[in-house]
Amino acid sequence: ENRLDNLLIVLGDFGANYFFNARDRAFKERLAKFPLTYFVIRGNHEERPSVMLEKNPMSWSAFESTAVGGTIYFEDNYPYIMYAKDEGGDYCINGKTICVIPGAYSIDKEYRLRNGWSWFSGEQMTEIEKTNLLKNLAPHYDYIFSHTCPLSWEPQICDLFFDGIDESKVDKSMESFLDKVISKTTYGEYFFGHFHDDRDLENNAHMLFHKAVKLTK
């Protein structure tokens, strides 16, 4: 069976480019045991694929994929793990139009830095990337996939916020940007991750963590 017939879309914090050592390789080897192709949208706890290519030009590649209708990055030893481009944008899978929007702010940034854990300075989209994405938005998408969610949806998920975190000090520029996105386009369904729970929201929006959803062809 062709791996491309079984495409799993991952909404960020995949864990494949985090440690940069044998732990990452072991994880990727385990993924190889499943007859799947992974299409990974970057979260906030992993390196940008363009940085992986820049640092490892002999073992990483980028090309236009007909499977997802856009630019993808991959590690040559693991071609079944495809990473969406840093700046997000348009893709097309099985004839369905898709907008991909990566990145988010790490609310535990200071804790990670104090403890010597990985933190990625490029975790959020840059202002240039945001401007270009807004400028190139289509009028409608069948699906929008992002890591975090629009700020206006937070009242539906505020019970998931961590105790002890002062929300007034959390950088929510990505969430505010996503409000602009949904004000400038329409969509059939919206899927996001980041908040470590599975639930359906209003406006045909779905938060995913453990749950997998089969998309209609």
What are these regions (language model features)?
Residues 1-93, 164, 174, 183:
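Core catalytic region of metal-dependent phosphoesterases/phosphodiesterases
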Residues 7-11, 143-147, 191:
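Structural motif
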Residues 17-19, 47-51, 91-93, 106-110, ...:
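Short catalytic/ligand-binding loop motif for oxyanion handling, primarily in non-cytosolic enzymes
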Residues 29, 37-41, 46-47, 56-69, ...:
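Conserved beta-sheet core of the metallophosphoesterase superfamily
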Residues 63-72, 94-173:
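Active-site-proximal loop/helix segment associated with metal-binding centers of metalloenzymes
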Residues 89, 120-125, 211-212:
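Adenosine-cofactor binding site in Rossmann-like domains, unifying the SAM/SAH pocket
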